[in-house]
Amino acid sequence: MGKGNAWDLLAADLVIVNGKIVTVDKRFSIAQAVAIKDGRVIAVGKDEDIKKLAGENTKVLNLKGKTVLPGINDTHIHAIAFGGTRPPLAVGVGYPAVKSISDIVKAVGEKVKTVKPGEWIQGWGWDEGYLQECLKDPSRHPTRQDLDSVSSNNPVCLNDFSGHVIWVNNKALELAGVTKATPIPSGGDIVKDPATGEPTGLLKELAAEGLVMRVITTLTREQKREAILTAMKELNSIGITSVTEGALGPGGGEFQGGLLGSECISVYNDLCNEGKLSVRVNILLLFGEYGALSFRDIQKGVSYLGLHTGFGSEWLRIAGVKLFADGIPPSKTAWMHEEYVSGGSGGLVIPGETDEERYDELIKMIVHVNRHGFQLGIHATGDRAIDACVDGYIKALEEHPWDARHYVIHGDFTTPECIKRMARHNIGVAVQSGIKWTTSDFMDNLVGEKRSAWQWPLKALLDGGVHFSNGSDAPVNYPNWKQGIEAAVLRESKATGKVSGPEQCISREEAIRSYTIEGAWQDHMEDIKGSIEVGKLADLCVLDEDILTVDPHQIKDIRTLMTIVGGKIVYDAR
């Protein structure tokens, strides 16, 4: 074999030059070029040095000064639900695709033309705060009659942007057996016309879950596969290369036609075996339904599974177990120490007759899961719920210590004292700074200006030494991580631009870390991803603007030009 051929065997597969390579290493150093071979980074440095690693068959990309970041890690997303609640499987009813009730009605009417009689029509994303009719008249809300006007034979179920409210037509109510006589379930609400007592078509929280969701026809395996492929294509187009599926398992079997069910894990595995995953997937297992998950469910699910955190591969792995502690602030179901402005303080969404019983049940679940070698990600938004989760984490780790890296999902109102406790015990937070941008305008009226300004205290978490990653919670929020960075840097609201809690703003570098290396830490994978360093997975995204210097109000509009996963180009918009 000649010298040239021997060199080609050692040469890089891909060389990227003339770029601004933001490595996100410990020094946040900037390089010009990077070389990749067999899906891994083999060199990072100056153009003249990296070019020497190119052989006859090496692909060379000249970025002409464009910026490169490590692949983005969305650490709390419902990816298959995101894909399954978007076209072609569902109707697009989120802003800015629709701006009025009439727009939504028109979109549903078009969908009716493409489905069989009796087939369910679903959608996600409507928001009264952006519907023209609701803005013009605050007493105007979406109704079943709106949807009945275009769909009398097909049941319709449209989730609002938060996923905690649904808007349905009369056919859906009929199939669910919901009438004016239906009692309102604990932890939920059936909105009824005050004049007639008839359901208006809006159902909230456990009323939506327990009455309507369970009668929606389960999607086929092929439809779930299509949902995953749709999601991955969209995620790659914006630079996302890793995700944590926020909840999949038997507890999600009745959500949106099975989009959080156990079969979804099997479908992911099929795609992994076929080499068709273009996003690295970490899965949190869900063993019981929202509001009904008990210690008995956890015992059955965890004790006999025979798995633990880390089972799987670089592409598909079990991350841990998902629990729900409370609800969300906009619904006043987040469990708070201090009452909401209008009264009430929320509560734990766990079986039990009293706060004490529910608290004890939560602690038992945490201790049991930790003992069996699973990382825990617990949905907790209110300060009292977060404190309860941290109580459980500390008790569990004291009884059975290991490098669990348990974390709170959301962590909206984490208190200064709780931050100290989290730092001492290596407990993290998975935040969604983009949701702060979406909701901060109306939080003042719910919890008062002081607490509203504190919500998602990113600077306090950083200063306190707490690891926090960032994500979208899609389909609750579109997974535009650039919007999330802008929100973390500016803390301006979506509707009015009002700054909420300026003292909690963080730098661009810190925000970028939350979407890259901090996500890798949460995944127990910081040694192989999260930064552009020798030996790590070659997951990169290329941007058309310099995210470190562009006007901060333009960060959200930066285009992704290219996404690379494992050294392969999976998206290219150059």
Segments predicted by a language model, with ranges:
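Basic/polar N-terminal segments that are highly enriched at the extreme N-terminus
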Residues: 1-12, 573-574
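Short loop/turn motifs at secondary-structure junctions and domain boundaries
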Residues: 6, 23-27, 313-314, 521, ...
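Divalent metal-binding segments
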Residues: 10-17, 22, 26-303, 319, ...
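His/Asp/Glu-enriched, well-ordered alpha-helical/loop segment
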Residues: 226, 367-377, 384-406, 410-411, ...
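Short helix-capping segments at alpha-helix termini
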Residues: 273-278, 310-311, 396-403
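Acidic, glycine-rich loop-and-beta core segments that form the ion-binding/anion-interacting portion
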Residues: 306
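Structural alpha-helical segments in enzyme catalytic/regulatory domains
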Residues: 309-311, 318, 423-426
